[in-house]
């Protein structure tokens, strides 16, 4: 179960909402891209510069682009080359936080981060390099995914709080969230779901700063229970990005 330890090590860095990676590729990293494979209904994307454009088949997306689907719409997207495919359901807004790889598209290391603001996505992450990472961030927390069919949904309760459901369809998903100020972590195997709901508000930056070490310890403990071997994956610096206030998007 080496893959669980790998997920746990990287979740220690990106375990809560609001934690982001650098947007520009570091030396040796190749900027990835997402390609739209199918569109039904009305769907648009917005560039980091704020330019909104319609989504059509073969549209190429890069890090920082935000996708929005209308009622009764859905979009299929291949993300970061061969690493994954995602189905974006109706009334969904998600941001491609990062898409990098090193090495070849088939054999290299893939680093993908998606920020689901509101709505639902489902997808498949292929088994690639052991050092690859794939995270889905929500306002409550983050899920680390590897070699897995998964779904994540974010619903607004209409009062500034949200309900989030993480599901592992096959494989394993490690998810972490802050509920009533306390960190909770779950390991989901095929067919299992975890719903975080009620009066749970988006994670605040101050909490992110103060809880990173605690989260690291909790996830490392879970990894060691599954695989006693120590986690040796390198942990990089945490980059915390303030969340916009007063937005209407959930999760």
Roles of regions detected by a PLM:
Residues 65-71:
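A short, solvent-exposed beta-strand micro-motif common in secreted/extracellular proteins
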Residues 45-46, 51-53:
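Periplasm-facing N-terminal accessory domains of Gram-negative outer-membrane beta-barrel systems
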Residues 1-31, 52-57, 76-89, 101-111, ...:
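C-terminal interaction modules
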Residues 95-126:
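A broadly used, surface-exposed interaction patch
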Residues 72-76, 94-95, 122, 149-151:
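Histidine-centered metal-chelating micro-motifs
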Residues 26-44:
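Short N-terminal segments immediately surrounding and downstream of signal-peptide cleavage
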């Amino acid at each position: 179960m080496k893959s669980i330890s790998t997920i746990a090590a990287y979740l220690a860095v990106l375990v809560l909402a609001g934690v982001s990676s650098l947007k520009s590729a570091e030396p040796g990293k190749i900027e990835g891209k997402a390609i739209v494979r199918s569109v039904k209904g009305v769907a648009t994307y917005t560039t980091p510069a704020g330019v909104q454009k319609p989504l059509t088949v073969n549209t190429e997306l890069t890090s920082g682009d935000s996708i929005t689907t209308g009622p009764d719409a859905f979009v299929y997207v291949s993300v970061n080359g061969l690493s994954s495919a995602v189905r974006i359901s109706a009334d969904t807004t998600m941001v491609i936080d990062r898409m990098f790889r090193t090495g070849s598209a088939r054999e290299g290391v893939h680093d993908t981060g998606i920020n689901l603001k509101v709505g639902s996505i489902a997808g498949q992450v292929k088994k690639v390099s052991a050092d690859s990472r794939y995270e889905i961030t929500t306002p409550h927390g983050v899920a680390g995914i590897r070699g897995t069919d998964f779904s994540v949904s974010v619903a607004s309760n209409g009062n500034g709080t949200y309900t989030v459901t993480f599901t592992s369809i096959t494989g394993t998903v490690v998810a972490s969230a802050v509920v009533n100020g306390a960190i909770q972590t779950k390991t989901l195997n095929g067919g299992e779901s975890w719903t975080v709901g009620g009066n749970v508000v988006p994670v605040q930056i101050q909490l992110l700063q103060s809880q990173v070490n605690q989260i690291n310890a909790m996830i490392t403990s879970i990894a060691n229970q599954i695989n006693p071997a120590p986690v040796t994956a390198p942990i990089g610096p945490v980059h915390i990005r303030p969340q916009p206030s007063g937005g209407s998007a959930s999760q």
